[in-house]
Amino acid sequence: MNHLTTETRNIQTMHLDEMNLSDALKTMNQEDQLVPKAIEPVIPNLTKVIESAIQRFNNGGRIIYIGAGTSGRLGVLDAAECVPTFNVSPNDIIGIIAGGQKAMTVAIEGAEDDAEQGAQDLKNIHLQSKDIVVGISASGRTPYVKGALVYANKMNAETVALSCNVHSDISKNSNHVLEINVGPEVLTGSTRLKSGTAQKLVLNMISTMTMIGVGKVYDNLMVDLRPTNQKLIHRSIRIIQDVCDLNHQEAIELYEKSDHNIKIAIVMHLCSTTQQDARLRLKQNNGVIKQAINT
């Protein structure tokens, strides 16, 4: 492991324990600022990943994140957030963590070293060739993730390796390679820091841009959100008010007439049509508002 960048000592923090608190925080902040720039070189590869994810999602495939420890938790987090944000099923975007759900809050000893379980966890969700599997591992050598990617390849699923070391092991088992070289961690080997931040940013990009590509966004608005609480209900009404140029009360009335569906409300108003017709237009255009209003 000595050759791994994530295990190398950071020369900026060699005496971290002797720094005063303010200087230590400034140093940590400076190191964190390196992360977004480290992602920039992989944007061409990331573009191909997202294009594939859009195509597969539109053909009934799923996006599956799989990892161990911090990497696994980040995948589960991103998948979970997609349900209310984009009104997708929990079965459309899935996060799997080594050791199961208990591992979200408690470290499960040895879980990351079980390559066979990585494959088994994909078998348990009935992996299909139309799915895309994103293996997440800061080191790029986690056996659990390697096992999952090897199995995914056998099933002819699309595979993506997301790591924070160049020439990583998991990259050898994937169709797409995303290697984010964030450099040594502030605290040597603590990949929950810069590596975790990089992984979170990349997962944000994958899920957000894929959902835009499948019609879940109008301009920069979350028009397919699931209004499950008061905050989201108010946001839904504000979106309708903004897009349709209505006052607050008019937006509320349209929201009610649309059966609490932002997309339907927008199409109803912009096309001066009924709820039934708006629903049909959206269905015929895969839920993409701008296509529906031009039909």
From Swiss-Prot:
Pathway: Amino-sugar metabolism; N-acetylmuramate degradation. The active site is at 81 (proton donor), 112. The keyword Protein biosynthesis does not apply. GO terms for biological process: amino sugar catabolic process; N-acetylmuramic acid catabolic process; peptidoglycan turnover. It catalyses: N-acetyl-D-muramate 6-phosphate + H2O = N-acetyl-D-glucosamine 6-phosphate + (R)-lactate. Its EC number is 4.2.1.126. GO terms for molecular function: carbohydrate derivative binding; carbon-oxygen lyase activity; ether hydrolase activity. Residues 53-216 form the SIS domain. It holds the Pfam family GKRP_SIS_N. The keyword Metal-binding does not apply. Homodimer. Specifically catalyzes the cleavage of the D-lactyl ether substituent of MurNAc 6-phosphate, producing GlcNAc 6-phosphate and D-lactate. Belongs to the GCKR-like family. MurNAc-6-P etherase subfamily. PANTHER family: GLUCOKINASE REGULATORY PROTEIN. This is N-acetylmuramic acid 6-phosphate etherase. The lineage of its organism: Bacteria, Bacillati, Bacillota, Bacilli, Bacillales.
